[in-house]
């Protein structure tokens, strides 16, 4: 009996040892996995910080370019000037490439908060039945694939979203008009920070956003001046809408393609080209001049940084003060790709 008892005790002891070994192995594996995750996380954080420092290091060069080419009100912005050349920084384990783009190649929806410019006193053109900005926005929405009726509805919702009051254009409460929206939300009653906010409007079809976001934007300003010197032929619908349809999209594309290599020197030079080549635009010329410019004060810097571990993309929105030339970043968005 003593022998059998001893054997049982040895068996139990062996079983306990095996259980402890299994538990220790599982714990060691878990510790190893956690260590690898922490190590990888640390490498990502170091790489991300390294790329951010490199991007911040490019800020001075970007500032110099914009102050040289974009400051001032009278000079036209050359489409392919030094400001538009890619800026590349290479380090021991990373590469950062930044591209400056003109952010005034779209209609600023926040300008709907300002009163429409008054028509010239000597204008012989027939006065429109709708405000000019309303016509422009609705036409751009229609060009984005939205029906005429839906475009009118979206425009009214957009105005309600931006203005500070709590009533709609039809004197109803905005809270009632937005009551059936899911998920529940109310108009912001302030400027849009990004044009993606337009997707929050109840009547806006999300499928139209890819096209609408190319011609509409949200700048922190109540003015909307489209820089005709940096428009591309694919943005002809925007120029056509600014002309209240006087220029067809094909005409607008040809006008953009015929732009001088260094861009138009002034709005008057642009207007002269427009009137000479498209005489039908004469009646709308004075109205159109209120919405076009040959330079820009808002820019977008698209930076891409690469290391062995990750890719970091940063989009910075920049404003250049037209008087002092001060360059200020008013928005920055990060996106990390592992």
What feature does the model see in each segment?
Residues 2-338:
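Compositionally biased linear targeting/interaction segments
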């Amino acid at each position: 009996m003593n022998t059998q008892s001893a054997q049982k005790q040895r068996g139990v002891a062996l079983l306990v040892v095996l259980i402890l070994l299994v538990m220790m192995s599982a714990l060691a594996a878990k510790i190893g996995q956690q260590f690898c995750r922490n190590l990888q996380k640390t490498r990502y954080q170091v790489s991300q910080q390294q790329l951010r420092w490199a991007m911040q290091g490019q800020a001075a060069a970007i500032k110099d370019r914009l102050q040289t080419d974009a400051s001032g009100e009278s000079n036209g912005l050359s489409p392919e000037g030094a400001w538009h050349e890619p800026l590349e920084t290479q380090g021991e384990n990373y590469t950062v490439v930044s591209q400056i783009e003109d952010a005034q190649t779209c209609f600023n929806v926040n300008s709907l908060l300002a009163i429409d410019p008054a028509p010239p006193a000597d204008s012989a053109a027939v006065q429109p039945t709708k405000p000019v900005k309303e016509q422009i926005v609705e036409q751009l929405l229609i060009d984005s694939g939205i029906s005429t009726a839906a475009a009118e509805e979206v425009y009214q919702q957009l105005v309600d979203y931006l203005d500070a009051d709590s009533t709609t254009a039809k004197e109803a409460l905005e809270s009632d008009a937005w009551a059936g929206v899911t998920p529940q939300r109310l108009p912001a009653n302030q400027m849009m920070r990004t044009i993606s906010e337009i997707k929050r409007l109840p009547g806006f079809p999300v499928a139209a956003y890819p096209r609408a976001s190319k011609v509409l934007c949200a700048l922190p300003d109540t003015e909307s001046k489209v820089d005709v010197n940096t428009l591309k032929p694919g943005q002809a619908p925007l120029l056509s809408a600014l002309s209240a349809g006087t220029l067809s999209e094909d005409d607008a594309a040809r006008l953009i393609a015929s732009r001088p290599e260094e861009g138009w020197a002034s709005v008057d030079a642009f207007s002269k080209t427009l009137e000479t080549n498209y005489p039908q635009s004469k009646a709308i010329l004075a109205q159109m001049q209120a919405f076009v410019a040959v330079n820009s004060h808002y820019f977008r810097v698209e930076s891409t940084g690469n290391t062995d571990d990750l890719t970091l993309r940063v989009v910075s929105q920049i404003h250049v003060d037209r008087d002092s030339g001060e360059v200020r970043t008013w928005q920055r968005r990060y996106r990390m790709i592992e």
